[in-house]
Amino acid sequence: SFLEGMATLRQLSFGLLDIGWHGQDPSSIQRVKDFENEEFQETNLYPDIAENAMSPSFSHIFNGGYSSGYYSYKWAEVLDADAFAYFKEHGIFNREIGEMFRTHILSKGGTENPMKLYKRFRKQAPNPDALLQRAGLL
């Protein structure tokens, strides 16, 4: 879809910034803007506005329970797209796949390692290509 690549890159950059902030000693960061420039180096497509610092207003990564977990937005989309692709491969209303989803995902909740549960359901690790295909990026 239109500008899907930009939206995806934007979310990835937010996740990388979050992990960057929580992956090192904050006292080692001298200037917020320099730190952001370093973190956004791989995802920035356009020149940045020198006076603009995102971190001070990006409350998700400092309060609200997302500390070093902002990436989970995009990861949830990967899981959603990959699980739905599995349903589509076997017929959207396939009873056996639905039962496997209920048995290995829904009924287990947080009682076991989520990746182990997902692999039991899907019989493989989540494939990010499913999200890229759904978004029209592959």
Model-derived regions, located:
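Cation-handling catalytic/transport regions enriched in His/Asp/Glu
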Residues: 1-138
